[in-house]
A protein has these predicted regions:
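Cytosolic regulatory regions built on CNB/CRP/Popeye-like sensor folds
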Residues: 1-151
Length: 151
């Protein structure tokens, strides 16, 4: 894909769409395109994560330690947390068909945020809203569990 095509694609990825075209240009230029065969493992649960992947084409099966599975496809950002901090992969990602991904290394993402403070602000606000929503959902689940707890 040409750089402008990659930028247009990245604009369709929910988290990345907040960043703006110039910030996405940095990511598109520095991202690595990887072609993955059907059945090939992109990463394994427990692997060190030094960046994220955006699925351009194809589908992946994500399997977690507890046996849960999820199928994801184009415009999915895999490993979002790894863009911000050192972490390990929480699941294994295996291609279900020939697939293409863009690998965004953490150092590139951090450099982009340093260069585009407005993009960093928008991203911080979005992540704060998502964290707030997750906290409310956890509180709701806890309230339901507490209501059913034997006294």
């Amino acid at each position: 894909m040409a750089i402008d095509d990659d930028i247009s694609f990245l604009e369709r990825v929910p988290t990345l769409s907040l960043l703006g075209r110039q910030a996405l240009r940095i990511l598109a230029i520095g991202a690595e395109t990887r072609y993955i065969h059907s059945g090939e493992v992109l990463f394994k649960r427990g692997d060190e994560a030094d960046g994220a992947y955006v699925i351009q084409e194809g589908r992946f099966n994500l399997s977690s330690k507890d046996g849960r599975e999820l199928t994801v496809g184009p415009c999915t950002l895999l490993g979002e947390v790894a863009l911000f901090s050192e972490t390990r992969r929480p699941a294994t990602a295996r291609a279900l068909e020939p697939s293409t991904v863009l690998r965004i290394p953490r150092f590139l993402f951090v450099r982009m945020l340093d260069s585009f403070p407005e993009a960093a602000r928008k991203l911080r606000e979005s992540l704060a809203a998502r964290l707030d929503q997750a906290t409310r959902e956890i509180s709701n689940v806890r309230a339901v569990l507490d209501a059913h707890e034997p006294k």
